[in-house]
A protein has these predicted regions:
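Structural recognition of the beta-strand scaffold that forms the well-ordered cores
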Residues: 95-105, 131-136, 159-165, 200-205, ...
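Internal alpha/beta domain cores that form substrate/cofactor-binding pockets in large enzymes
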Residues: 97, 126-156, 168-201
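Extracellular beta-sheet/turn segments enriched in Thr/Pro/Gly and aliphatic residues
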Residues: 69-90
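Short, acidic Ser/Thr/Gly-rich low-complexity loop/linker segments typical of extracellular
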Residues: 7-15, 20-21, 27-44
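A short, solvent-exposed beta-strand micro-motif common in secreted/extracellular proteins
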Residues: 47-62
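Catalytic His-Asp segment of secreted/periplasmic serine-dependent ester chemistry enzymes
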Residues: 208-307
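Active-site segments of SGNH/GDSL-like serine hydrolases
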Residues: 164-170, 191-226
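Serine-esterase "nucleophile elbow" of acetyl-processing enzymes
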Residues: 84-138, 148-157
Length: 308
């Protein structure tokens, strides 16, 4: 059988529903397995007769849900198991809004596209369909991002928003002298605005800067980034928003300077790290997924501003 993204929620595969979900646990009649490429699965020793079948909720990608369906064993053809991603009625399935500053724009990469094109190609290979709209705007801080997000949401009507803001906030004197200034609350507002618009947020942690630029206080700035990211993660946990662990992935590398084109902007190798962090965040479960999904409402993952 196979596990598919049931875009319209009718429980059956329709012609345009081409997304399949690999690496998800499934269960039929007490037998379990994991989907492979193309969302395929094959379970041995399933008892004959009517059996309950479904994807295991705690293994689904972030924000997906699943309900059981009844199947007859032995089946006469493929068993198609549905998984749902509840979005607003006007939102477009499989559309992602990349939203941030010049790092989202892609400055510093060879093709000036950053992580976006490669992530789109990776998602198309893994799930079967993805369109990423790049709404990055250079030299903007998180407060400017908060102001322009509603317009971008209305214009593009995405299913997901990939939020990567905070790097330029350090340049505001208030953010250095009155930590944590506005950054975390602006990110929280973006998460809530995303949900209010019927989409799902993925929050990227702020990447470090290149420590090789000794004349630009990189040690002090990277300490600021580290402390801010601690608060970003706390906020995301409070909002039950999925995190793309960009900062942690950078810090796990052997050396930071080879990942940068300049003081702030990653090079191609650095953008690959951002790409992989967003890919994992989209395709892997939310932390504590079993508890989170148990409390789902009928239209959105959580109402805007909800707290655990």
């Amino acid at each position: 059988g196979f596990l598919f993204y049931d875009e319209n929620g009718n429980g059956t595969t329709d012609g345009a529903e081409s997304v399949r979900l690999p690496s998800v646990g499934v269960s039929i009649g007490g037998q379990t397995g994991t989907t492979t490429a193309g969302g395929r699965f094959s379970l041995a020793s399933v008892p004959n007769g009517a059996q309950s079948a479904q994807a295991r909720t705690e293994t689904l990608p972030a924000y997906f849900t699943a309900t059981g369906v009844s199947v007859t064993v032995p089946a006469t053809g493929d068993v198609a198991l549905p998984a749902r991603l509840v979005i607003g009625s006007r939102n477009r399935p499989n559309v992602y809004l990349a939203f941030g500053d010049s790092i989202t724009v892609g400055e510093g990469s060879t093709d000036e596209e950053g992580y976006v094109d490669d992530l789109e190609a990776q998602m198309r290979t893994f799930w079967g369909k993805a369109d990423i709209v790049n709404a990055g705007q250079s030299a903007t801080r998180s407060d400017a991002g908060r102001s322009r997000l509603p317009g971008e949401l209305g214009r593009h009507r995405p299913a997901y928003v990939l939020i990567l803001y905070g790097t330029n906030d350090y340049n505001d004197p208030a953010c250095r002298s009155a930590f944590p200034c506005f950054t975390v609350e602006m990110l929280r507002d973006m998460v809530q605005d995303t949900r209010s618009a019927g989409a799902h947020p993925i929050v990227g942690t702020i990447p470090p800067v290149n420590p090789q630029y000794a004349d630009r206080n990189p040690t002090e700035r990277n300490d600021w980034v580290r402390r801010m990211n601690d608060l970003v993660r706390q906020m995301a946990a409070q909002e039950r928003a999925q995190v793309a662990e960009i900062h942690g992935d950078f810090m796990r590398q052997a050396s930071l300077p080879p990942l940068f084109a300049d003081f702030l902007h990653p090079n191609d190798a650095g953008y690959q790290i951002i790409q992989q962090a967003f890919f994992r965040a989209i395709t892997q479960p939310l932390p504590g997924a079993a508890a989170t999904f148990a409390d789902l409402g009928p239209t959105l993952l959580l109402p805007p501003g909800a707290r655990p």
